[in-house]
Amino acid sequence: MTEEKVERVPPIEERTLPKRDLKEQPYRLLVTGSEGFIGKYLVNFLSLDQVYSEFVIDTLDIKNGQDIGDFTRPDIRHDCVIHLAAFADIRNSLDDPERFWENNVEKARGLFKYCEVNNIRLLYASSAGAKEWWLNPYATTKKVNEIMAPHNSVGMRFFNVYQEEFKSRHDMLFKMLEEKTATYLTRHKRDWIHIDDVCRAIARLIPSTITGIVDIGTGQSTSVIELAEAFHQGDLPIKEDTPGEPDELCADISKLNPTGWYPTYDVLSSVRMHPGYEFNPNYAKGNKSNESTELETPQQEGKEEET
């Protein structure tokens, strides 16, 4: 992991948000799904950031009794909406596709319309699975979101987001391996991206002129088996039959390059730096535990480096 003491986001004068007297009228963001895994970290990240701490951040979440399906045009106008409220579970979507369609598609229509009519910048959660949207109902809802979104919005295709120290969602493989509750492995390869890097990417996208679909990952895939081996759990049984799931997912992060963003965490390094990590001599035989797997920092000419 790298920790460089530099600005997380560009200074305000470099932003594309409308310029105005912020004391009279501060910038205003709306974050839906603010109590979810990504949403909670994002709101905290923005509130601590030296630039975004000056913004007014409104939140909306079902856990606070606020259903996105009941969204109506507010009295105040937002400068940007970050829509993270959605069901995200492949297996449950296979069991109840109608419920996922209602929540992820139908309930989002009012919010999308609000942004379109008022020309408000919209960043919404899509999924890496939307590329092969036909594999499961969850991915289908994310693909439909991409189709129905306003033309000047950003569909953020999140890859496998994780956070160490038992802070990921309970149903995420990374946390299951931390807790030693995983019962099987698969042969899948996934692009694991740290929650801090996700928040930094969103912070960069808010003021940018980028639109369309944007992959938010590291650009490197790691197999489930390799990750399990790093956790000393490579001997778990392999499940071959995994309906609805793609074999490999890996982000193309080139569209984020103009923002100066790059990933700063590597999932295998995160495991080795885990408080409960113990050296695995079998894993070291592949020269994987003696060498740093930190991602190389790309040269961003004319761009600031990130923390």
Question: Model features per residue range: what roles?
Answer:
Residues 53-73:
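Adenosine-cofactor binding site in Rossmann-like domains, unifying the SAM/SAH pocket
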Residues 135-139, 143-199, 203-204, 230-232:
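NAD(P)-dependent short-chain dehydrogenase/reductase
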Residues 185-187, 213-214, 222-229, 233-254:
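C-terminal "lid/loop" region of Rossmann-like NAD(P)-dependent oxidoreductases
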